[in-house]
Design a protein with these regions (language model features):
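Blade-edge beta-strand/turn elements of extracellular beta-propeller
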Residues: 4-20, 72-91, 130-144
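Structural signature of eukaryotic scaffold interfaces centered on beta-propeller domains
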Residues: 25-32, 91-106, 152-168
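Short beta-strand elements that form the blades of beta-propeller/WD-repeat-like
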Residues: 3, 36-41, 106-119, 169-177
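Generic long, charged, amphipathic alpha-helical segments
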Residues: 121-176
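Short, solvent-exposed loop/turn segments at conserved positions within beta-propeller repeat blades
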Residues: 50-68, 120-126, 179-183
Length: 187
């Protein structure tokens, strides 16, 4: 892991040793005194195994079974210490936050729920939306329903919103497709 001071040059790069993982999406990053805090989705297995019963496309399908969870890293710029751990262990990814809070402490993150293979999941299908309170680790979950799948969501703050407003005052937007009525999609 590396950081470069926003006021520095390439010579200011710092390396930090973390538990091995793959990070597809970061929710947010901010400073707290000597610490840089980063929330994101952590995968411990970026090279999943294929199952033999899926034929010649099995290796491609294996990569579409993303296993990741909401995770927090803390990097101390003064001492080099790293603290890290799960915020939650639910399989989620494609995380978003209110863009007004990019680079400053944020409380909420919105993730797509991805069922694991042993939960009846197949490939990268989003079956629900999960709202995390990263301060408490609590979550609210909305399932789209049987045969209904969502797209990567975006967060849209209400018109005219600033960081003086409630961080959660906006809209999480995803396109949802009902595969039972393929000619119909919902926002």
């Amino acid at each position: 892991m590396l950081f470069r001071s926003r006021h520095g040059s390439g010579g200011d790069i710092r390396w930090f040793d973390c538990e091995p993982c793959y990070i597809l999406h970061v929710s947010n990053c901010w400073e707290e005194g000597d610490w840089v805090v980063m929330d994101g989705c952590r995968s411990t297995n970026p090279m999943p195994s294929a199952t033999s019963d899926e034929g010649e496309l099995s290796h491609m399908l294996a990569y579409m079974r993303l296993e990741a969870n909401n995770y927090r890293w803390r990097f101390n710029l003064r001492t080099g210490e790293v603290r890290e751990g799960d915020i939650d262990d639910l399989n989620t990814e494609f995380n978003k936050t209110n863009p007004l809070y990019a680079g400053v402490k944020s409380r909420y993150a919105y993730h797509q729920r991805i069922p694991l293979l042993e939960e009846g999941g197949h490939t990268l299908r989003f079956t629900g939306l999960v709202k995390y309170d990263n301060n408490t680790g609590s979550r609210q979950q909305w399932d789209y329903g049987d045969g209904v799948f969502g797209s990567e969501a975006v967060y849209a703050p209400k018109a005219g919103a600033t960081r003086d407003n409630d961080e959660d005052d906006g809209y999480v937007i995803t396109l949802v497709t009902d595969t039972r009525e393929i000619g119909r999609a919902h926002v």
